[in-house]
Structures are given as structure tokens and as C-alpha cells.
Amino acid sequence: MAAYSSVSTFLALRSDRRLGELVDAAVPLGSGIGGRSALLKVDGKPVFVKRVPLTDMDLMPEHVRSTANLFGLPTFCQYGVGGPSFGAWRELAVHTMTTNWVLGGQYQGFPMMYHWRVLPDSGSALPMELADVERAVAYWGGGPEVRRRIEALQQSSASLALFLEYIPHTLHEWLTEQVQADEESADRACSLVEGELEAGTSFMNACGLLHFDAHFQNILTDGRR
């Protein structure tokens, strides 16, 4: 917890300008439908940074931190399968919940969030899945609300920066390595995955959180949890 407190305090005390400079200088890791990610270090400790685009609608005072479906999207768009999604504030809400569970000793199976900040950001293009706006609108039902959401993302001038505990592997990568190693490693890994997924899912559901994007490339592991 001392390391968490140190990193959290360091980030919280940076001005928007200084924090933006740190994020801009971070090592890029990738980008996709959920935003862009990078790796920075605070006193030698790796910190995973995720930037999720915020629309002008998200930034209206009455909508800040709202998890509502502001654009009136079809409900199937909330699944993380390449759709326009419901908004960045939902992601913040989830990380706030899971971090507090870890800090409160209720469940240790989530990466902790050190800090979050809204930062100016106009350098991101639409992700590949939405880049062809006409095609994406048609694929997701053709409704005007879908078009408004995608075009709002396209015109985004800010992002939600989430500063998270760095977990080195996706479950997909790690499990593939274990299965290819030998039978004993594969059995041990499969047992760990089954137990952790069952425990984590049961805990989240009991606390009122339902995860719609729990595929193996969106689950992280350090080989122990």
C-alpha cells in the first residue's frame, strides 16, 4: 500500500500541463476500440496509462461522471465487441469500484487505479472498427443516435486518462505460453484461470457489477492472480 500511496500522491499533485507532458512522453503500448495505452514510470514503478476519448456531451457539467446512455444507443452497443459504447465515465466508475474493493481488502484480483484526470487530447483518430463512419453506422443498426455518437468521438477534444497498476500479461498471452510449455504447466495454469475467473466473476456480480467484455485479451495476469 505504501507504493500505491506514493504513486497516487505524485500523480495527484501534478498540474494538468505537467501531467499531460508525462503522458505524452510515456511509451506507447497500443490503441484500439477502448482508447490508447502507454507505459510511464513514477520513481521507477511502471504505471499503465489508458486514454479514453470524451465527447463534448460527456463533458457537459450535468453529464460529468454520468454512466447514463447519453446518446440513446441501442443496448447491444454496451458490449465491448467493436461498438461505439456508452461512454468513458462507465470505465471510471468501474475502476473506482474495483480499486476500493482492493484497498478495502474485499477482493485483490483487480488492478488498482492510482489517479484519473481529464486532459486535452485532439491527437487520436477513430479506431479501426469505427473509422469508416458510414459502414460503422450501418453495421450498428443505422440509427441517428449511432451516427451522433461516432461523430462526437471523431470530434473529441479531450480524453479521460486513467493511471492504473501495471500488470504485464494478457491472460491470452500468458495462458498460451503455459499450455505450450508442458502438461504440468498447462494443468496448473488452467486450474488457476478457472478458479480466479469464477471467484472474480462471482464477486463482481454479487456487488452489482456485470462485465460485458471479459475475453482473454482483456483480462490481465502476473501469473499469480
Language-model regions, residue ranges each:
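C-lobe/activation-segment region of protein kinase-like
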Residues: 184-187, 206, 224-225
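Conserved ATP-binding subdomain of kinase catalytic cores across diverse folds
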Residues: 15, 20-162
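Catalytic activation segment of kinase domains across protein kinase-like and atypical kinase folds
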Residues: 126-127, 134, 210-225
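Structural motif in protein kinase domains
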Residues: 167-178
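Activation segment of protein kinase catalytic domains, centered on the conserved DFG
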Residues: 179-192
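Protein kinase catalytic-loop region centered on the HRD/HxD motif
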Residues: 201-209
